[in-house]
Amino acid sequence: MRIHDIDPDNRPRERFLRSGKESLSPAELLALILRSGTAGLNIIDTCNKLISEHGLERLADLSIQELQKTPGIGEAKAMQIAAIFELQRRLHFARNMNLKVKGARDVFEYMKGRIPDETKEHLFVLFLSTKNQILRHETITIGTLTASLIHPREIFKAAIRESAHSIILVHNHPSGDVQPSNADKQVTSILKKAGDLLQIELLDHVIVGNNDWFSFRDHALL
């Protein structure tokens, strides 16, 4: 069935105008953007197949080549889909610029979409103002976190350059288990001592993974 074969009152465009965007399913919203299917393939069915196969969250991370594996999704449509999610990511970043950190949840929300490859462990440092606003973040290491990879001098040199009042460490666990390892605790201890010496406080160390987080401060480990 083609879009034009659907009762006019039930077509996505008409329902959007009549009842608002909330009345449409994710597949219908995507179909509105992609607009047309290919020979023998209804664009709504194509979008339903795409979302049911990958899930909406996973869809945002698919490459152009992976998107094209779904029948009816060529290069142009794959680029449109990738562009949608890239805009969404940039909007999220823009809304979180100068975010005031009140707790670990704020750090978790800020880091969403900012870890380029979640199959690898990344360590970031967030530089904060006197009002606990995030000035900037920087990637410190990529790979398994060990004390030998961490150079406090470089981290705090960057903090001084940014005129940061305090810093927060953030790293991900690709396994999804956010409990800290002994190495995580060792790194935190080293950087806390360096921060105390330089009077640039290490406010927290937040581990993220599998839509969850662990805060050293919340667990009285700082």
UniProtKB/Swiss-Prot annotation:
CDD domains: MPN_DUF2466 (cd08071). A motif (JAMM motif) lies at residues 171-184. Zn(2+) binds at H171, H173, D184. Residues 100-222 form the MPN domain. InterPro entries: MPN (IPR037518), RadC_JAB (IPR025657), RuvA_2-like (IPR010994), UPF0758 (IPR001405), UPF0758_CS (IPR020891), UPF0758_N (IPR046778). One of its GO terms (biological process) is proteolysis. Keywords: Hydrolase, Metal-binding, Metalloprotease, Protease, Zinc. This is UPF0758 protein CT0611.
